[in-house]
Swiss-Prot record:
Protein name, as recorded: Cytochrome c oxidase subunit 1
Organism the protein comes from: Hippopotamus amphibius
Gene (name only): MT-CO1
Annotated pathway: Energy metabolism; oxidative phosphorylation
Mitochondrial intermembrane topological domain residue ranges: 41-50, 118-140, 213-227, 287-298, 358-370, 434-446
Residue ranges, Mitochondrial matrix side: 1-11, 87-94, 171-182, 262-269, 328-335, 401-406, 479-515
UniProt subcellular location: Mitochondrion inner membrane
Length: 515
């Protein structure tokens, strides 16, 4: 029975739960790695050993957080749980493939761990650039294991993307058009399209790297007519859409949370929100070389990538102001989920502003590979993606479990986390402007103060993570059951009660069209 339910599952709710648990578990591993980084950088001098070990930790931290925490939770967890419920589908289009998508992840995670355990580990950074990732600088199996790990995670995501696209297009009630689906469903659809188009390019790049390392091809070796910059183009053609893949489902969740706790029946500017997400998805594919301003591109090329990157600020601005307009005039309920959403809007905007700074190719020449970049992407990930995940979790926890969280503790948790992440990452802007480079385990004494403060912030965040575990435990032992949910007419996922029955929408939903 246990095996049939959890190992061979074809139920979107159970698979979503597996994704959430796996993502939470990986998130703990990723948090542990980040604390190793901040412990090393807490004061000048060496803590862990050499820079190879440090860079293995940094690389693992990135891969774990991106491929095993954010993506499984947002797309696998919330996506599986909510998309079928929101469109009134009985399950995903391909329920068994759905199960395989999940079960490819634990082996992938094990391969990544194995890569750290053999030889010297993969100290390449998450970008895995050759020649550092070649078989001279990284002899042994570490990088090869990392590449296999990425292959598995990539196959998992591609299959999941196919599944979501098919489900969303094909399994709506006959009367429901695409423009009547909730914004979270749209965000997952667009994310899935991005995954489907970008991951094969990554697969090609890392496969060529694999053959360069093991079969003496020279795709990225100038000695044989190759070019390491080709790898950078292939990697970032995936890598830039990837960062939008990480944030788009968050946009969808924030839209739902802000609408719900403003007491509105719909978000402000639904069509604008949809088109903005589609624009972001499209533009995300034509700006990749802004990660490569320092490799010696033509001035006209740099001018194009600078301006194209700045254009993304327009649809992003549409979304931010639409969220604010949704709040406007609403009967605002200061729930923990609303606090996460408001924190998201503010801090994501700050991260977006530093992104506009970095989009300027002239400035980026100076700021590239400094802590300014680290601060930028951690504002949009550690306070964008993670705040969206936390907001979505406390908002939909009653749906998933049938129990309510302790409101007061959840708010305290938010405050601690808010202080922690800001104290960790705000000082890194100063370090970057002062020229402290990324990916080094030690630094000149001049950088000590801000690094110490940053490391203190990371330990405050750790207390927040520990508190979150306690809050979830408290909810399950107290068993406060959900009595009633507001606004179910415009929030279809709550319609079947908390938690919903194992099978929902076994007969097609009746859709009442009102113009």
């Amino acid at each position: 029975m246990f095996m049939n339910r959890w190992l061979f599952s074809t139920n979107h709710k159970d698979i979503g739960t597996l994704y959430l648990l796996f993502g939470a578990w990986a998130g703990m591993a990723g948090t542990g790695l980040s604390l190793l980084i901040r412990a090393e950088l807490g004061q000048p001098g060496t803590l862990l050993g050499d820079d190879q070990i440090y860079n293995v930790v940094v690389t693992a931290h990135a891969f774990v957080m991106i491929f095993f925490m954010v993506m499984p939770i947002m797309i696998g967890g919330f996506g599986n749980w909510l998309v079928p419920l929101m469109i009134g589908a009985p399950d995903m289009a391909f329920p068994r493939m759905n199960n395989m998508s999940f079960w490819l992840l634990p082996p992938s995670f094990l391969l990544l761990l194995a890569s750290s355990m053999v030889e010297a580990g993969a100290g390449t950074g998450w970008t895995v650039y050759p020649p550092l990732a070649g078989n001279l600088a990284h002899a042994g199996a570490s990088v090869d294991l990392t590449i296999f790990s990425l292959h598995l995670a990539g196959v998992s995501s591609i299959l999941g993307a196919i599944n979501f696209i098919t489900t969303i297009i094909n399994m709506k009630p006959p009367a429901m058009s695409q423009y009547q689906t909730p914004l979270f469903v749209w965000s997952v659809l667009i994310t899935a399209v991005l995954l489907l188009l970008s991951l094969p390019v990554l697969a090609a790049g890392i496969t060529m790297l694999l053959t360069d390392r093991n079969l003496n091809t020279t795709f990225f070796d100038p000695a044989g007519g190759g070019d390491p910059v080709l790898y950078q183009h292939l990697f970032w053609f995936f890598g830039h859409p990837e960062v939008y893949i990480l944030i788009l489902p968050g946009f969808g969740m924030i839209s739902h949370i802000v609408t719900y706790y403003s007491g509105k029946k719909e978000p402000f500017g639904y069509m604008g929100m949809v088109w903005a997400m589609m624009s972001i998805g499209f533009l995300g594919f034509i700006v990749w070389a802004h990660h490569m301003f320092t490799v010696g591109m033509d001035v006209d090329t740099r001018a194009y990538f600078t301006s194209a990157t700045m254009i993304i600020a327009i649809p992003t601005g549409v979304k931010v102001f639409s969220w604010l307009a949704t709040l406007h005039g609403g009967n605002i309920k200061w729930s923990p989920a609303m606090m996460w959403a408001l924190g998201f809007i503010f801090l994501f905007t700050v991260g977006g502003l530093t992104g506009i700074v970095l989009a300027n190719s002239s400035l980026d020449i100076v700021l590239h590979d400094t802590y300014y970049v680290v601060a930028h992407f951690h504002y949009v990930l550690s306070m964008g993606a993670v705040f969206a995940i936390m907001g979505g979790f406390v908002h939909w926890f009653p749906l998933f479990s049938g129990y309510t969280l302790n409101d007061t503790w959840a708010k305290i948790h938010f405050v601690i986390m808010f202080v922690g992440v800001n104290l960790t990452f705000f000082p890194q802007h100063f370090l970057g402007l002062s020229g402290m480079p990324r990916r080094y385990s030690d630094y000149p004494d001049a950088y000590t103060t801000w690094n110490t403060i940053s490391s203190m912030g990371s330990f405050i965040s750790l207390t927040a993570v520990v508190l979150m575990v306690f809050i979830i435990w408290e909810a399950f032992v107290s068993k406060r059951e959900v009595l009633a949910v507001d606004l179910t007419t415009t929030n279809l996922e709550w319609l079947n009660g908390c938690p919903p029955p194992y099978h929902t929408f076994e007969e097609p939903a009746y859709v009442n069209l009102t113009s």
